From Swiss-Prot:
Catalytic activity: 4-imidazolone-5-propanoate + H2O = N-formimidoyl-L-glutamate
Source organism per UniProt: Staphylococcus aureus (strain JH9)
CDD domains linked: Imidazolone-5PH
Binding site for Zn(2+): H76, H78, H242, D317
Record's protein name: Imidazolonepropionase
Role noted for this protein: Catalyzes the hydrolytic cleavage of the carbon-nitrogen bond in imidazolone-5-propanoate to yield N-formimidoyl-L-glutamate. It is the third step in the universal histidine degradation pathway.
Record flagged with keyword Nucleotide-binding: no
Record: residues binding Fe(3+): H76, H78, H242, D317
Gene3D superfamilies listed in its UniProt record: Metal-dependent hydrolases, Urease, subunit C, domain 1
Location of this chain's protein in the cell: Cytoplasm
Pfam families: Amidohydro_1
Listed SUPFAM superfamilies: Composite domain of metallo-dependent hydrolases, Metallo-dependent hydrolases
Family: Belongs to the metallo-dependent hydrolases superfamily. HutI family.
Residue numbers binding 4-imidazolone-5-propanoate: R85, Y148, H181, E245, S322
Length: 412
């Protein structure tokens, strides 16, 4: 006897399962089954496809008029941080620049101070609250970066918190050491601080899967970033890079040359960089909510990347300064509107390709896969990025069990 059948599904989303990320035109290929059925036993998918009455189960969910998809994957977050920076919104409205806010004690260094002052247990409680919000919105796989400690003690603290979260909730969660995220005030130079972070790599390896660096004007150069990435690979890490967010320094080209698993942001990437994606499996992780939140007009050139047969994914970039959202559904809407992605491209970018960007087996619904699914209160898959700003996830299913039920009930 099976454990659960989800029947009469209006649309069942079945992303293509591949060893490598979907590239170029492949991203627009999405198998959407009308009147579908999913059968689950022992936390695994037994069947997913056209409606059938050939299976029995102890529990049945009628998904008439609903969409079922793989659980979403958020491939770029800064989940563990102390404090918040809502007071900076009024400063921005007054016309204060980021550098002016930084000089006033705000910006990223404000978050660094708050993170340093927050105990590990309190940091865990805050991050847990934010993670549960993600889960309620349909996310069951997450990448979590450090980068707000900027010293040994507090970078380790952030990584330990994300590891504790993964253990408590048994999630597909990857952890990224982003020590070189900024340069703290106490550092004698960028170069000296970078060497401090490189020296930490062997110690943080037990807590982190990836090593990341912020390659940008005024932070770390291309040469420094390459040095760090090579040292990280020597220490056994797969590497990522925050690249070309503001200036076209060549971060995307560097990521491809160093065989990074992903390059993230890429708002200002050059045509040369986009062309190099053609022969690379490095995933371009685009973060349109960041561009939106910062009030900028120029978004990453997703269409240019796809035209060059590149692989792209989408993520929230959840952080307290430039993308204060942990709702990946909102990112899907912004990507459709501003990156000009089709519904199929959007869905693949938050499932199977996002999984490839963090090196996990997720984002598909195939026989034998973990039964990590979302039942959406939506008539079709195009409706979710169309009707933006709300939570369409009705039920979230992890390992075959409903762990979130957002069904609303009211008393008159």
């Amino acid at each position: 006897m099976n454990d659960l059948i989800i029947n009469h599904i209006a649309e069942l989303i079945l992303p293509k399962s591949t060893d490598k990320p979907l590239k170029g035109k492949e991203l627009d290929e999405l198998n959407v089954v009308k009147n579908g059925t999913v059968v689950i036993k022992d936390g695994k998918i037994v069947y997913a496809g056209q409606h059938t009455d050939d299976y029995d189960a102890t529990e049945t969910i009628d998904a008439s008029g609903k969409v079922v998809s793989p659980a979403l994957v958020d491939a770029h977050t800064h989940l563990t941080f102390g404090g918040s920076r809502e007071h900076e919104m009024s400063l921005k409205r007054q016309g204060k620049s980021y550098l002016e806010i930084l000089e006033m004690g705000g910006g990223i260094l404000s978050t660094v101070n708050a993170t340093r002052e927050t105990s590990e247990d309190d940091l865990f409680k805050k991050a847990e609250h934010d993670l549960l919000t993600m889960i309620k919105h349909g996310v069951l796989a997450v990448e979590s970066k450090s980068g707000y400690g900027l010293d040994r003690e507090n970078e380790l603290k952030q990584l330990k918190v994300s590891n504790r979260l993964a253990e408590k909730y048994d999630l597909d969660m990857k952890h990224t050491f982003l020590g070189p995220h900024a340069v703290p005030k106490e550092a004698s130079s960028n170069e000296a601080f970078l060497e401090e972070m490189i020296a930490l790599l062997p110690e943080v390896k037990q807590y982190a899967d990836f090593a990341d660096i912020f390659c940008e004007t005024g932070v770390f150069t291309i040469e420094q970033s390459q040095h760090y990435m090579q040292k990280a690979k020597e220490a056994g890490f797969k590497v990522k890079i925050h690249a070309d967010e503001i200036d076209p320094l060549g971060g995307l080209e560097l990521a491809i040359d160093e065989q990074a698993i992903s390059a993230d942001h890429l708002v200002a990437s050059s045509d040369k960089g986009k062309e190099k994606l053609r022969n690379s499996d490095t995933v371009a992780v685009l973060l349109p909510a960041t561009t939106f939140y910062l009030g900028k007009e120029d978004y990453a050139d997703a269409r240019g990347m796809l035209d060059n047969n590149g692989a792209i994914a989408l993520a929230t970039d959840y952080n307290p300064g430039s993308s204060v959202t942990n709702n990946l559904q909102l990112v899907m809407a912004i990507a459709a509107l501003k990156l000009k992605l089709s519904p199929s491209e959007v869905w693949n970018a938050v499932t199977v390709n996002a999984a490839k960007a963090i090196d996990i087996n997720a984002g598909t619904i195939n026989t034998g896969d973990k039964a990590n699914l979302v039942i959406w209160d939506a008539p079709n898959h195009e409706y979710i990025p169309y009707h933006f700003g709300i939570n369409h996830a009705e039920k979230v299913i992890k390992d075959g069990k409903v762990i979130v039920d957002n069904t609303l009930s009211f008393k008159a």
